[in-house]
């Protein structure tokens, strides 16, 4: 997959960069693997905004993705690669030898007709799923479990990965794409390869409407608000806020660490993320 630059026939198209989806499935998703998803627009059950800048967006069907990969020893053939509106990565439709079908996160390089399998004896090829203790040091993996059998939670978005750095008894050391180095139980499963759609970071939507299709509402600057709405609000004429940048709740917003110091999982993190 790649990106496509559009002809600059308008001012907004001049900077627009979109994904080239010509190699993806153009039909409907597998009917047995979809469910309805209701957009809450960032509201909770009482109608109160709990997440700002969220809107309705385009209607979507949720694709049920298999993050556990617990069909051990059963080979599956990749029927097709599909676009998933609910995530940045592409997904692959698998057809198992016993007739069952499922969606998985598509790793980079996976293509129609490839055969994948889950199990300790599997080859180190993109799409195969193994226990971390069975994967060679230096291998790039994704969809990594934190608790055995609970399904992958690490490295699932487009272009992300975790590299197996070393093995130490019950644990292995993983370096995430953020730079964080973390201990994970060696009995957890992971899938070989880097997540597909590496060019997602280069996309430029080009117009406000595409953001609205994705369910993203406008972000208003604090200095444009009233004093009751934001610490930067108010003032006569155009003002700069008069203080160091903060969130609407007064928390410094330029690099302040927000992770709790006494979090129980701190003992598993050997090096914090380069991105803070």
Swiss-Prot record:
GO terms for cellular component: large ribosomal subunit. Keywords: Ribonucleoprotein, Ribosomal protein, RNA-binding, rRNA-binding. One of its GO terms (biological process) is cytoplasmic translation. It holds the Pfam family Ribosomal_L2. InterPro entries: NA-bd_OB-fold, Rib_uL2_dom2, Ribosomal_uL2, Ribosomal_uL2_bac/org-type, Ribosomal_uL2_C, Ribosomal_uL2_CS, Ribosomal_uL2_dom3, Ribosomal_uL2_RNA-bd_dom. Residues 254-270 have a biased composition (Basic residues). It comes from the Bacteria. Residues 224-276 are annotated as: Disordered. GO terms for molecular function: rRNA binding; structural constituent of ribosome; transferase activity. Part of the 50S ribosomal subunit. Forms a bridge to the 30S subunit in the 70S ribosome. One of the primary rRNA binding proteins. Required for association of the 30S and 50S subunits to form the 70S ribosome, for tRNA binding and peptide bond formation. It has been suggested to have peptidyltransferase activity; this is somewhat controversial. Makes several contacts with the 16S rRNA in the 70S ribosome. This is Large ribosomal subunit protein uL2. It comes from Ehrlichia chaffeensis (strain ATCC CRL-10679 / Arkansas). The gene is rplB.
